């Protein structure tokens, strides 16, 4: 575990299919990410999937892995110290989409208690991420050309009230 990593918020049994990330999840997920997610990380920060996942793991105070019914990783998401939230997934996330949506909304609400502002930028073309963010209660602030490739992204936010 990286130095300075904050103690994980307690994940109760009720959060089925989401567990604390271990670094081997990065190795497993990197070559399997969705095309849309690969494009989003390349256009925003110019990293390859392995670099993006490793960076997310190392820079996030809280990092979680989404697993299927056989405990196989299908995605990762996390939050950095300033409330920057992110999600990267494989195409297999569609197989567990209903349970993931139900559980991730609970986890995002729990995260929002710790981080009063959750925010980031999302590629306007990444429909799965846009739907997930809306489902979890995020609001879209503005559309701007963003990142190393200056592609259209939405800035999004969720405030704890």
Annotate each predicted stretch with a short phrase.
Residues 5-31:
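A short beta-loop-alpha structural element at the N-terminal edge
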Residues 103-118, 136:
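Conserved acyl-CoA
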Residues 53-65, 116, 151:
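A short helix-loop-beta-strand connector motif used in the catalytic cores of GNAT acetyltransferases and
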Residues 65, 70-86:
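Conserved beta-strand in the GNAT
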Residues 35-53:
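Conserved GNAT-fold acetyl-CoA-binding loop/helix
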Residues 118-134, 139, 145-150:
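Conserved beta-strand-loop-alpha-helix junction that forms the acyl-donor binding cleft
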Residues 146-161:
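C-terminal "cap" of GNAT-fold acetyltransferases
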Residues 86-102:
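A short, internal acetyl-CoA/4′-phosphopantetheine-binding micro-motif in the GNAT/acyltransferase core
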């Amino acid at each position: 575990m990286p130095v300075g990593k904050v103690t994980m918020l307690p994940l109760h049994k009720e959060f089925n299919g989401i567990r604390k990330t271990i670094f081997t999840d990065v190795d497993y997920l990197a070559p399997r990410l969705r095309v849309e997610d690969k494009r989003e990380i390349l256009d925003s920060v110019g990293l390859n999937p392995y670099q993006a996942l490793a960076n997310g793991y190392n820079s996030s105070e809280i990092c979680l892995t989404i697993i299927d019914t056989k405990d196989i990783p299908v995605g990762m998401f996390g939050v950095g110290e300033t409330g920057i939230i992110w999600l990267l997934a494989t195409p297999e996330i569609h197989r567990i989409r209903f349970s993931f949506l139900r559980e991730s909304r609970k986890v995002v609400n729990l995260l929002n208690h710790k981080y009063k502002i959750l925010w980031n930028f999302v590629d306007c073309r990444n429909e799965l991420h846009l739907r997930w963010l809306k489902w979890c209660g995020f609001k879209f602030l503005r559309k701007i050309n963003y990142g190393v490739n200056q592609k259209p992204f939405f800035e999004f936010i969720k405030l704890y009230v």
